[in-house]
């Protein structure tokens, strides 16, 4: 895990090294000051030598200023390194996620990926900054303080060393009991993010069905779960400070008692006892800092594993290792006894023994009841998923032989869920082809029957689209996404229920334009409405992940019970 994460340090290695270097020098100077203060008391104040007091006082101030500069430098370098490292980490994660297949996304879930990119990386940033500064400072401060304390009085050193194993045992006990809560907390954050995303995305449905109270209650449950888990973890961690305070008070009392006896017995000077107090406090404070570091590292460990899981996840769909095909000759599609299941461990097949040949330039309709795997079937063509068994061929070649960009540039898919991005309508259309000219944009929009309503908008093609396309209707959004797909000038065009929000007249105009202007493009149309596919060259009827029948509209009406029942039902409801 650590090796995976640290690859993202890259250009911030210098700052990562400079921060602990400054800390080490700072600690050496800082730990020398109590020793000087002891000399100042014993050789200056006790003897009435004010010249010595002034000289050592000025020297102490100089050391303190140097220590201040080094401390500020260490803070700057650690903050700079941690922020840069985290920026790289987020970039590496986001870049890697772009290569994920749908299977990878399904495994992690989009809500979990958002949490890992934000909350988890923030935890790692804090832990990294603490590790290259405080995690260096605390042990060095402890070691140097211990050395200085022993050099002053090994007897008094033994007094406070008794407290160290007690504190160490208490810290281990606290950490051991608190650690299991943090993975549960981050899983709860994933669930909260999922609910928030769903609510915001479906806010219109929430208001339409008056489900605000239910959504608020669900949100309360999620936040309450996080609160309870965090409260339990923090309750355990809260014992850390009282235990430390109690031990510090006990040690100081013991030092005062035994130190006073040594002074009375002329075995220790007053200044040396003052120095011992400082070194003892430094050692005990080091332990307190270490306990804080361990707390932060516990949270970061859970976050680190989650981030590393993303970075080390192998995309399930990749380019062929040797000589990928970089051109698609035609739009022929062949499903050769294709089987598919979403989970390889699952016994259930989403698709079973699909055997189908679609000729280049053919218009194929696909219909079936909800859950019959129509969308799953077409997802195999651009390799959004890979088949479990059998093969899918495009243009005479297995889709696994193609360069992914080449394949997907030649297979345009307009999915059920239409997504528009913040920007102008023209910007959204250019997702299909960044180099498209204005003439090509208008050509695609006219085929999709979008040119008319776009020109009626305040700024035409330069009209801004709000987040998620909230300022355009469902039918307008569908037509824009169809135009976007057409700009790819694909060999294969797949419309997955992409005209469900368009009126019948406009839909027919779209089909006529597609047939007229794209005669050589293979067109695959998935629809729940028979009127949308009845004029297709052939229609595939799917049922429970299998092809039940293939034929023209007239043929299927006569011989297929499922198709004829759907047609009859829709005809009766249209009257």
What are these regions, as identified by a protein language model?
Residues 49-53, 148-162, 232-306, 310-311:
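Helix-loop-helix
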Residues 11, 15-28, 63, 130-185, ...:
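Transmembrane helices of ABC transporter permease
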Residues 1-33, 37, 45-59, 74-78, ...:
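Membrane-integrated ABC transporters
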Residues 11-13, 99-103, 119-128, 132, ...:
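An intracellular "coupling" helix at the cytosolic face of ABC transporter transmembrane type-1 domains
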Residues 326-575:
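ABC-type nucleotide-binding domain
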Residues 97, 219, 307, 335-337:
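Conserved catalytic Walker-motif region of ABC-type ATPase nucleotide-binding domains
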Residues 21-22, 29-42, 63-110, 114, ...:
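Juxtamembrane helix-loop junctions of ABC transporter transmembrane domains
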Residues 93, 97, 206, 307, ...:
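Helix-loop junctions and hydrophobic alpha-helical segments within the transmembrane domains
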């Amino acid at each position: 895990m650590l090796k995976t994460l640290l690859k993202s340090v890259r250009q911030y290695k210098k700052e990562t090294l400079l921060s602990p270097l400054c800390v080490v020098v700072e600690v050496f100077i800082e730990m020398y000051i109590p020793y000087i203060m002891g000399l100042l008391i014993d050789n200056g104040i006790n003897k009435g030598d004010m010249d010595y007091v002034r000289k050592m006082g000025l020297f102490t101030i100089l050391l303190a200023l140097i220590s201040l500069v080094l401390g500020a430098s260490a803070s700057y370098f650690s903050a700079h390194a941690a922020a840069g490292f985290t920026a790289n980490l987020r970039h590496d994660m986001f870049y890697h996620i772009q290569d994920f297949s749908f299977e990878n996304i399904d495994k992690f879930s989009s809500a979990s990926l958002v949490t890992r990119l934000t909350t988890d990386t923030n935890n790692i940033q804090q832990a990294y900054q603490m590790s290259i500064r405080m995690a260096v400072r605390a042990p060095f401060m402890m070691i140097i303080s211990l050395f200085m304390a022993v050099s002053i009085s090994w007897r008094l050193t033994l007094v406070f060393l008794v407290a160290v194993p007690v504190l160490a045992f208490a810290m281990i006990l606290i950490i051991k009991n608190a650690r299991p809560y943090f993975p549960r907390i981050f899983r709860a954050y994933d669930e909260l993010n999922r609910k928030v995303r769903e609510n915001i995305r479906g806010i219109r449905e929430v208001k339409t069905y008056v489900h605000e109270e239910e959504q608020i209650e669900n949100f309360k449950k999620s936040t309450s779960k996080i609160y309870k888990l965090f409260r339990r973890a923090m309750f355990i961690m809260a014992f850390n400070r009282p235990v430390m305070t109690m031990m510090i008070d006990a040690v100081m009392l013991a030092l005062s008692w035994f130190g006073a006896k040594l002074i009375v017995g002329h075995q220790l000077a007053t200044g040396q006892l003052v120095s011992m107090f400082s070194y003892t406090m430094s050692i005990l404070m080091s332990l307190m800092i270490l306990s804080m570091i361990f707390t932060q590292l516990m949270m970061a460990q859970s976050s680190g594993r989650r981030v590393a899981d993303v970075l080390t996840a192998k995309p399930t769909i990749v380019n062929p290792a040797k000589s990928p095909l970089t051109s698609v000759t035609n739009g022929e599609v062949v499903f050769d006894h294709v089987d598919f299941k979403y989970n390889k461990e699952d016994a259930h097949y989403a698709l079973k023994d699909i055997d189908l040949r679609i000729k280049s330039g053919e218009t194929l309709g696909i219909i079936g009841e909800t859950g019959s795997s129509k969308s799953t079937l077409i997802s195999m063509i651009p390799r959004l998923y890979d088949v479990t068994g059998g093969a899918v061929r495009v243009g005479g070649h297995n889709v696994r032989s193609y360069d992914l960009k080449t394949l997907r540039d030649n297979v345009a898919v307009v999915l059920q869920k239409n997504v528009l991005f913040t920007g102008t309508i023209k910007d959204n259309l250019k997702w299909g082809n960044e180099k498209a000219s204005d003439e090509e944009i208008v050509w695609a929009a006219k085929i999709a029957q979008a040119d008319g309503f776009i020109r009626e908008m305040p700024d035409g093609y330069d009209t801004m689209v709000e987040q998620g396309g909230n300022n355009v209707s469902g039918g307008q959004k569908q037509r824009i996404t169809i135009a976007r797909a057409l700009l790819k000038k694909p060999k294969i065009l797949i419309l997955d229920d992409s005209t469900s929000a368009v009126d019948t007249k406009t839909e027919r105009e779209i089909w006529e334009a597609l047939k007229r202007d794209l005669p050589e493009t293979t067109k695959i149309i998935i629809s729940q409405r028979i009127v949308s596919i009845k004029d297709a060259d052939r229609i595939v009827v799917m049922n429970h992940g299998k092809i039940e029948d293939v034929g023209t509209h007239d043929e299927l009406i006569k011989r297929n019970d499922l198709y004829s029942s759907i047609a009859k039902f829709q005809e009766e409801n249209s009257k």
